[in-house]
Regions:
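Short, solvent-exposed loop/turn elements at domain surfaces
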Residues: 56-62
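Bacterial signal peptide processing site
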Residues: 29-30
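Structural motif
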Residues: 39-44, 62-63, 159-164
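N-terminal export signals
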Residues: 5-26, 111
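Mature-region segments of soluble proteins
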Residues: 49, 67-213
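Post-signal peptide N-terminal segment of mature Sec-exported envelope proteins
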Residues: 36-54
Length: 213
């Protein structure tokens, strides 16, 4: 699977354009990226646990073995705007807070089934956030058109960052399927939970990896 096909798969699995995808495709750094963040070993371990919850080790290697956490750190530094970098970092604290509320301890100390429950619980939050973001962008479109019509050259469009967990899911899939472990251990990705496909094509011998939607 080439990078372009992989981006299409990630977009379909996460319901949106891949954040920083154009720079991933071109293999270059986003000129609007913020200052490089110094991710610690603990940060990388946290990203690995999130990714491993999405792609756990089964008969094929998991995301942790594929070093997806390190991939996330590189992509956030090289391909994300400063605004999205900030949202991504704040997402770590948000996941820990959600885990403490649900299970009484940090995400890193949670049992695998509790980690999965925490990440699945974020789906309604994502849908609500994306709806608000869509409305926000529409308002900005209207304001920009009005400014252009009035000849206002001082108008500066405001932006709203992507949801942190969409970023984490996208980077998990990208990181896994660009790793040696992902390329050799799996050939397809079907999100779970995801939309029902009653006649999913399957060929004998196909390897299917499932993960959180």
């Amino acid at each position: 699977m080439d990078r372009r096909e992989l981006l299409k798969m990630v977009a379909a699995a996460t319901g949106g354009v891949v954040i920083g995808g154009e720079f991933f495709l071109a293999g270059c750094k986003n000129p609007e990226a913020g200052q490089s963040t110094e991710f610690t070993e603990n940060d990388i371990a946290f990203f690995d646990e999130v990714a491993e919850t999405i792609f756990p080790k089964t008969s094929t290697p998991g995301a942790k073995e594929a070093k997806v956490g390190q991939f996330m750190a590189v992509m956030v530094n090289d391909c994300y705007t400063e605004e999205n970098q900030k949202a991504f970092r704040e997402g770590q604290a948000a996941i820990n807070a959600a885990c403490k509320k649900m299970h009484g301890h940090d995400f890193m100390k949670a049992a695998p089934e509790h980690k999965k429950a925490v990440l699945v619980s974020l789906d309604p939050e994502i849908k609500d956030y994306q709806a608000k973001r869509k409305e926000f962008n529409k308002e900005q479109d209207d304001l920009e058109k009005k400014a252009q019509a009035n000849g206002d050259t001082n108008f500066k469009r405001k932006t709203m960052p992507d949801h942190y967990f969409i970023m984490m899911k996208q980077l998990t899939i990208l990181g896994y399927f660009t790793s040696k472990e992902g390329r050799t251990g799996a050939t397809r990705y079907e999100p779970v939970p995801g939309k029902y496909i009653g006649d999913l094509d399957y060929k004998k011998g196909d390897k299917i990896i499932t993960g959180l939607n």
